[in-house]
């Protein structure tokens, strides 16, 4: 269905979204949606199935991964130290696999993040965070995680509290924003979350052969290719027409196989609920 603001009234019994069993999966879905708004396809992967052997230039996202098993700690530290970027949000790393809190005292990823948790505070069902890098306002839900930076740079504030950091560690970087920003965006305006992921996943976005030049909420693009051709499928799930900015113009020889959309330079207009398919030869790029 077309994306709408999904903000609901706080239940009388006080069981907020962030306390429900679905919070982790909805956080993952919110991050996926925010990255997909740039016209790219993020990969969802189970930790043991992920290839950790070559982290250089790669980015992983841990969205509200409340239980972080001890077997993953060294892999995550190595991933960043050897050139990867790790983004952690929400209550990621609150427990280990035995439900022991690992954020207090000797946090195993403290050197990697360059910071540690001071405390989590319940603020409001929905509130906003001021982010410096990128310069945007992030929606958040229920809790804010307050950080005590060691060597990390503060990138987000809530009042006088540091609630987001980035830290160069070895050859890589760790970005930590321990508030439920994906759930905040899920129930409200997701633009700030899309801007956040657009900044910290920029390398992966720019490596795509074609992507959106600005986030397009409710629009998806998928690319397929053969050795000689490329095919782009664009779907607008909004109830109204949208103008999509592309990272580069489609080749003049691109053929429209489906839909009514016509590209004009670096933009394409899609009607309400429209699907458009374009095919072109790679040598024309």
Task: Enumerate the language-model features and the residues they cover.
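Aromatic-Pro/Gly-enriched surface loop or interdomain linker
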Residues: 1-57
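A conserved amphipathic helix/loop scaffold
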Residues: 63-285
């Amino acid at each position: 269905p077309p994306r709408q603001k999904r903000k609901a009234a706080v239940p009388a019994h006080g069981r907020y979204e962030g306390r429900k069993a679905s919070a982790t999966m909805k956080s993952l879905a919110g991050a996926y949606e925010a990255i997909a708004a740039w016209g790219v396809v993020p990969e969802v992967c189970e930790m043991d199935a992920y290839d950790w052997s070559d982290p250089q230039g790669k980015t992983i996202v841990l969205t509200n991964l409340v239980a972080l098993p001890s077997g993953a700690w060294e892999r995550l530290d190595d991933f960043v130290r050897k050139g990867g970027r790790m983004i952690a949000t929400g209550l990621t790393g609150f427990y280990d696999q035995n439900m022991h809190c690992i954020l207090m005292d000797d946090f195993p990823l403290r050197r990697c993040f360059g910071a540690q948790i001071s405390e989590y505070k319940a603020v409001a069902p929905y509130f906003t965070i001021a982010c410096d890098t990128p310069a945007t306002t992030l929606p958040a839900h229920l809790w804010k995680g307050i950080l005590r930076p060691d060597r990390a740079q503060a990138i987000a504030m809530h009042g006088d509290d540091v609630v987001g950091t980035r830290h160069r560690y070895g050859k890589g970087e760790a970005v930590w924003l321990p508030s439920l920003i994906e759930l905040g965006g899920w129930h409200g305006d997701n633009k700030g979350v899309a801007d956040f992921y657009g900044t910290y996943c920029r390398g992966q976005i720019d490596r795509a052969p074609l992507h959106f030049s600005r986030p397009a909420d409710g629009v998806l693009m998928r690319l397929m290719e053969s050795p000689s051709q490329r095919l782009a499928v664009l779907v607008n799930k909004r109830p109204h027409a949208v103008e999509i900015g592309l990272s580069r113009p489609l080749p003049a020889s691109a053929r429209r196989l489906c839909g009514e959309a016509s590209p004009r330079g670096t933009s394409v207009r899609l009607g309400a609920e429209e699907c458009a398919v374009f095919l072109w030869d790679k040598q024309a790029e």
